[in-house]
């Protein structure tokens, strides 16, 4: 397919996860890759747009006010947003012809893709526009959705199972009008998780795998949600850090703690890193025996 103007080929690679129950291989497209040190990446050439999503901590806190919480997400959300035909040549990629492996085909995306700088803005703008159209017919639910959306995730609920079921049903109806499918429903009221789509079958997703989620738990915007006890928890990475300044900084930085629940614990790790910096050691130099002892106790 000959290009008619601007043109960019996005590199991609396969990510293999042998332990996954469903998708063992994912294709990752890297729009931040550069051809060389002086060439800009595709993302550097694009305007990321306005920040339209809600604040993460606000969505999480508001969801905790409901006695009955529900959480779902939009199925393949970015791929539901179509790109103008005149812009699609910037989303080209190479693909090996399965029938003739010696041939390489040039394909292009017709919809927004994950990892593209403007994709969150394009998705957020599409959702906001659609909700504005639906507002006259569903004023209460639209307001609820607007406060509970974070990119493609919806957190909502009610003080009773009946109210939460009503919100869930109306939200599915609203998004369905724009061909968005809400799926992967989770709730602390298990009867609300029953679905009529094969797409919602439970399994060890990548998010669950990363969080080390157990049966009855799921990922809630990156936190581990125990639906039976209705508690959320912070996950600490299990891998052993190198006993260097770089190693302990990497370990502390991997603790995802958006609500500050584990602040008292992470503070100790940060203080150890501060002490390592004050000793003016190189990034990969071994820590002193005193700091190693403190780190191992932490």
Where do the protein language model's features map onto the residues?
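Conserved acidic
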Residues: 1-298
């Amino acid at each position: 397919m000959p290009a008619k103007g601007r043109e960019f080929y996005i590199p991609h690679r396969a990510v293999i996860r042998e332990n996954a129950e469903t998708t063992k291989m994912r294709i990752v497209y890297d729009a931040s890759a550069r051809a060389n040190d002086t060439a800009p990446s595709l993302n550097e050439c694009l305007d990321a747009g306005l920040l339209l999503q809600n604040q993460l901590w606000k969505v999480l806190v508001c969801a905790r006010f409901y006695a009955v919480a529900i959480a779902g997400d939009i199925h393949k959300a970015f791929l539901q947003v179509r790109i103008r035909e005149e812009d699609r040549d910037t989303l080209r990629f190479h693909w090996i012809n399965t029938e003739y492996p010696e041939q390489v085909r040039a394909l292009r995306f017709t919809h927004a893709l994950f990892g593209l700088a403007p994709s969150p803005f394009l998705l957020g703008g599409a959702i906001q526009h659609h909700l504005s159209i639906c507002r006259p017919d569903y004023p209460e639910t639209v307001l609820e959705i607007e406060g509970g959306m974070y990119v493609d995730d919806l957190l909502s609920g009610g003080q009773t199972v009946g109210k939460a079921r009503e919100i869930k049903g109306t939200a599915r109806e609203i998004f369905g009008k724009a061909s968005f499918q809400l799926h992967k429903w989770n709730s602390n009221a298990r009867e609300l998780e029953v679905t009529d789509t094969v797409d919602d079958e439970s399994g060890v997703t990548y998010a669950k795998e990363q969080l080390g989620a157990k049966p009855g738990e799921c990922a809630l915007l990156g936190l581990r949600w125990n639906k039976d006890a209705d508690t959320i928890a912070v996950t600490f990475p299990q891998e052993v850090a190198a006993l260097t300044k770089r190693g302990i900084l990497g370990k502390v930085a991997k603790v995802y703690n958006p609500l500050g629940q584990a602040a008292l614990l992470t503070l100790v790790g940060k203080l150890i890193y501060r002490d390592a910096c004050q000793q003016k050691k190189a990034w990969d130099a071994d820590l002193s025996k005193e700091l190693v002892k403190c780190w191992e106790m932490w």
